[in-house]
Amino acid sequence: MKKIALFNHQPECSIECCNGIIRALSSQYEVKLFTIQDDLDEVLNDVDGIVFPGGIGDSDSYHDFFTRSKANKIAAFLDRGGRYIGICMGAYWAGSRYFDFLDGIDAVQYIKRPTAEIRRSYGTVADIEWLGQKEKMFFYDGCVFTGSGYYDTIAKYANDEPMAIIQGNLGLIGCHPESEEFWYESPYQ
């Protein structure tokens, strides 16, 4: 069974996001949780991928967690063939203001796009198309991917902009496919 490392730091990385990811992936992957206190070399030593979940993290919390040295260790892990999964906040963190892993594209705030049908950052349900199938997915100030670099679009928002992409060994998702059923109930919307 392949092993993935899942970043967990309350409250910036929601424990609910981590629990949803564990439930979704634990039948196919051994999930190893890690925090900012863990030695990143040890964390990355025996895993196939690293996962950064959603949460309330922003640029301030990112820079509190990840020095350039730690970011370089993750970049070296990717260069060795490791995989990166970023959901919502984790997808933003792959962008130019943070880890800077994307090539020719960036992760930007969806609600600020001129044709976005969602205009506020609070939790709601987004209409998306995932591999050609219409779906509804939990959205909480997620990102969209812009730019001229090459990537494969896995899912799109209602305005046809990319919501989930694969670029090389990065898998990035703006919404929350790991969402639990209760997320769709008040007060989360």
Sequence positions of predicted segments:
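N-terminal beta1-alpha1 cap of cysteine-dependent amidohydrolase-like domains
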Residues: M1-D46
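A structural signal for short, well-ordered beta-strand segments and their strand-loop junctions
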Residues: L6, K32-T35, I85-I87, G171-G174
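Flexible loop residues that form catalytic
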Residues: H9, G55, E178
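Short catalytic/ligand-binding loop motif for oxyanion handling, primarily in non-cytosolic enzymes
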Residues: S14, S59-D60, W93-S96, E161-M163, ...
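Structural motif
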Residues: G49-G55, L170-G174
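A glycine-rich, often tryptophan-bearing local segment used as a flexible ligand/cofactor-contacting loop or short
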Residues: G57-D58, Y62-I128
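Catalytic beta-strand/loop cores that center a nucleophilic Ser/Cys/Thr
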Residues: R119-W183
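Acyltransferase
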Residues: Y184-Q189
